[in-house]
Every structure is written in structure tokens, then in C-alpha cells.
From Swiss-Prot:
Region (Disordered): 1-53
GO molecular function: death domain binding; ribosome binding; translation initiation factor binding; translation repressor activity
GO-annotated biological processes: apoptotic signaling pathway; cellular response to amino acid starvation; negative regulation of autophagy; ribosome hibernation
One Pfam entry name: DAP
Keyword Cytoplasm: no
Family classification: Belongs to the DAP-DAPL1 family.
Protein name per its UniProtKB record: Death-associated protein-like 1.S
Domain of life, per lineage: Eukaryota
Function of the molecule: Ribosome-binding protein that promotes ribosome hibernation, a process during which ribosomes are stabilized in an inactive state and preserved from proteasomal degradation. Acts via its association with eiF5a (eif5a and eif5a2) at the polypeptide exit tunnel of the ribosome, preventing mRNA translation. Plays a key role in ribosome hibernation in the mature egg by preventing mRNA translation, leading to ribosome inactivation. Ribosomes, which are produced in large quantities during oogenesis, are stored and translationally repressed in the egg and early embryo.
Length: 113
């Protein structure tokens, strides 16, 4: 088994810098190589430098939302919500549409003997 690992890791077995794809069920599946030890700390690493600028951006967004909320309150007194609801509703039909039942077409066919 150790011989197989040495053969696979040799530069001759590598294609384009990685292991060749393996066929499984008629489809090619790539084998992922890498150290699990190296990838785990990157996922769990805390990025405090990126959190600080985002918190500043969040504060500016919150201030902008407060300004907009004040403007919306002024507009709500000028234009009531009931008028907006009526404008967005579908118009009621004056004549109701009559739905005809589907016709069943029975084809008379002779019985099998």
C-alpha cells in the first residue's frame, strides 16, 4: 500500500499538477488531495480586521434607515395606506364568468372476445 502512495504522489502520475480523475459509475470523479490539518484552521480563523470596517458600515446603514423612517412617517400622513391598498387591488368584474363543466366524450367500442 505504501508503494501505491509513492507511485501516485510521484510527478509522473500527476496530470496538470493533480491526480487524474477516477471513473465511478461511468462518470469521472476528481480525487481531492490536501491536508485536513491545514484547511481546518483557515475555516475557524477569526478575522477581526474585517469585522471592524463592517461594523462601521452597519452604523452608517442604520443612520440612513433612521433618516428614511422619518421621511416615510411624514409621507404616511399625506397619503393614507387605505388609498394605496385600493389602488393595488384587482378590479372586480361586472359580469361573472360562467364556468362550463367539462364534457365527457365516451367512445363506444366493441368488447374484446
Amino acid at each position: 500500500m505504501t508503494k501505491e502512495l509513492k507511485v501516485q504522489s510521484s510527478p509522473q502520475a500527476l496530470k496538470a499538477g493533480h491526480l487524474p480523475a477516477v471513473k465511478a459509475g461511468g462518470m469521472r470523479v476528481s480525487k481531492k488531495q490536501g491536508n485536513d490539518e491545514n484547511s481546518a484552521p483557515e475555516k475557524n480563523a477569526k478575522k477581526t480586521l474585517q469585522e471592524k470596517p463592517s461594523s462601521v458600515l452597519n452604523m452608517t446603514k442604520m443612520q440612513a434607515m433612521n433618516i428614511l423612517a422619518g421621511e416615510l412617517e411624514k409621507l404616511s400622513h399625506d397619503f393614507p395606506g387605505e388609498a394605496a391598498q385600493i389602488a393595488h387591488q384587482k378590479p372586480r368584474p361586472t359580469v361573472e364568468k360562467i364556468i362550463m363543466p367539462k364534457r365527457l366524450y365516451l367512445i363506444q367500442q366493441p368488447r374484446r372476445c
